[in-house]
């Protein structure tokens, strides 16, 4: 186990390089094939079986211990209360910048966790569904702040998380379309008492100043049983973001119904410049102000290199 130079002796994290972390796999079986992985890839990020074996299988093993421990604690609580134990999902929060690979991480984890021996039901929810509609953002002058905390319907997200964590059935999740860059009015996904919920979002580790006891403020992270932050250097994420926009420009943006179809009238150089501008003026600002400052609230940090591979893992010890 190595020590990161810039972290002092009272760091709350244990740090592991790739080889050290991979050793924690032990005898956890690899349940994914190359064919399975093909369905899980991101727009620009390719996850190899080697990455799954060395990084995600040990993480899956760790989570299996954590979920079991949480279930035992929950059983003890309801035994003490003398009440029947409800079915309450284990909630995992995955945070990080735009284009850092949160969705790919969520998909790989879902695939692995759902293949545990007891075959748990795993659902992935993204906070995109809780963005205000473009019409409302336009009215409030927030279109250029899309993805910032104020662009989300936080009361609705908190109500949904409370319902899920209370064991309610058939909880409705609003649907967001990246193709139309907007909420799909009247369309919902249903979450019906899964065993595990993965919540993926930009600002989900963010907190503020809590109010008085009479006005106790609740944060998204209050509902998490485990939280994970996907990290990389800002200049590296910028390149990934530009590459992703160019990839969409060559494919989905060609659809006349796509919100960004107008970009297909530009050259590749112009689109790259557009993406860089959006990164610098919006996404980087959000990262520095609302995402990165809360990285150390996560229980586990995955640190990526420029080739998308995870090179270091930080596990909270306290």
UniProtKB/Swiss-Prot annotation:
Subcellular locations according to the entry: Cytoplasm
Amino-acid positions noted as binding ATP in the UniProt annotation, renumbered to this chain: 96-103
Entry's Gene Ontology cellular component terms: cytoplasm
Keyword line: ATP-binding, Coenzyme A biosynthesis, Cytoplasm, Kinase, Nucleotide-binding, Transferase
Pathway(s) this gene product operates in, as recorded in its UniProt entry: Cofactor biosynthesis; coenzyme A biosynthesis; CoA from (R)-pantothenate: step 1/5
Catalytic activity: (R)-pantothenate + ATP = (R)-4'-phosphopantothenate + ADP + H(+)
Location (main, coarse): cytoplasm
Enzyme Commission designation: 2.7.1.33
InterPro entries, alphabetized: P-loop_NTPase (IPR027417), PanK (IPR004566), PRK/URK (IPR006083)
UniProt entry tagged with the keyword Metal-binding: no
UniProt name for this protein: Pantothenate kinase
Taxonomic source organism: Coxiella burnetii (strain RSA 331 / Henzerling II)
């Amino acid at each position: 186990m190595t020590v990161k130079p810039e972290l002092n002796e009272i760091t709350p994290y244990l740090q592991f390089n790739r080889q050290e972390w991979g050793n924690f796999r032990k005898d956890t079986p690899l349940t994914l094939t190359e064919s399975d992985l093909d369905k899980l890839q991101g727009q620009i990020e390719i996850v190899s079986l080697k990455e799954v074996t060395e990084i995600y299988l040990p993480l899956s093993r760790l989570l299996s211990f954590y979920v079991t421990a949480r279930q035992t604690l929950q059983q003890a609580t309801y035994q003490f209360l003398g009440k029947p134990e409800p079915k309450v999902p284990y909630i995992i929060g995955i945070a990080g910048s735009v284009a850092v690979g949160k969705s790919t991480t969520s998909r790989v984890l879902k695939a692995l966790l759902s293949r545990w021996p007891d075959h748990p039901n795993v659902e992935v929810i993204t906070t995109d569904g809780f963005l205000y509609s473009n019409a409302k953002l336009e009215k409030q002058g927030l279109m250029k702040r899309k993805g910032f905390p104020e662009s989300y319907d936080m009361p609705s997200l908190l109500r949904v998380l409370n319902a899920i964590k209370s064991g309610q059935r058939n909880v409705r999740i609003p649907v967001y379309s990246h193709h139309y860059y907007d909420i799909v009015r009247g369309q919902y996904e249903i979450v019906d008492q899964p065993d595990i919920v993965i919540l993926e979002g930009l600002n989900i580790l963010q907190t503020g100043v809590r109010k008085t006891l009479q006005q106790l403020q609740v944060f998204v992270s209050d509902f998490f049983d485990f939280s994970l932050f996907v990290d990389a250097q800002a200049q590296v994420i910028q390149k990934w973001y530009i590459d992703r926009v160019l990839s969409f420009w060559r494919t989905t943006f060609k659809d006349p119904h796509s919100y960004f179809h107008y970009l297909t009238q530009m050259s590749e150089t112009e689109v790259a410049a557009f993406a860089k501008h959006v990164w610098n003026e919006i996404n980087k600002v959000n990262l520095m102000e609302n995402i990165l400052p809360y990285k150390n609230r996560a229980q586990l940090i995955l640190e990526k290199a420029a080739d998308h591979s995870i090179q270091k893992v930080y596990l909270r010890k306290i």
